Regions:
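Active-site HxH/HxHxD metal-binding segment of metal-dependent hydrolases
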Residues: 1-18
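Alpha-helical interaction segments
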Residues: 3, 66-67, 130-132
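Metallo-beta-lactamase
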Residues: 18, 25, 30-114
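Accessory terminal helices/loops
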Residues: 86-88, 99-159
Length: 159
């Protein structure tokens, strides 16, 4: 590539923006916290397609990763997905996994809600961090990375 690229964004918005790419209307939305506090969805209304970024991953090998250092939230994730699900689309491009459907994104939303509720339930039962970690691994397929990045924050947020 020629010239210098600063890496800085050229479009900045708080909640919603319209841009045109290749003659197509594209809508950008920030609905709230999920994987981070900066998750943005890119909506192509004419194509009924949503690029969901890291707020939605698809496939068993890609469970929820709550990036607390980046402002993520287990508590708010499902609500953020609810807002995105209000858009009129059929096709979803996740950040990880294959292109899929709105129905699969709705299942993922339910999983984020189940995760949030389960962590809260385990805290109420006064389970230890290690006991909660085991549940996250067995019920939600969390790998060591998820435990390292997300578990302490999820416990703190759900208390």
């Amino acid at each position: 590539m020629e010239g210098e690229l600063s890496g800085l964004p050229t479009v900045v918005f708080e909640h919603h923006a319209h841009i045109y790419l290749g003659g197509k209307n594209v809508e950008l939305y920030h609905f709230g916290r999920a994987h981070t506090n900066g998750d943005v969805v890119v909506y192509f209304p004419a194509d009924r397609t949503l690029a969901a970024g890291d707020m939605f991953t698809f496939g068993d090998a890609t469970p929820e990763l709550i990036d607390y250092a980046g402002g993520g939230s287990a508590k708010e994730w499902a609500t953020t997905l609810d807002s995105a699900l209000q858009l009129d689309f059929d096709t979803v491009v996740p950040s990880h996994g294959v292109v899929t459907t709105k129905a699969e994104m709705r299942k993922y939303r339910n999983s984020t809600l189940a995760l949030r509720n389960r962590v809260h339930e385990l805290i109420v039962q006064e389970k230890t961090r290690d006991e909660i970690a085991k549940v996250m691994q067995t019920e939600f397929h969390w790998a060591q990375l998820h435990l390292d990045v997300s578990l302490n924050g999820a416990i703190a947020e759900m208390q």
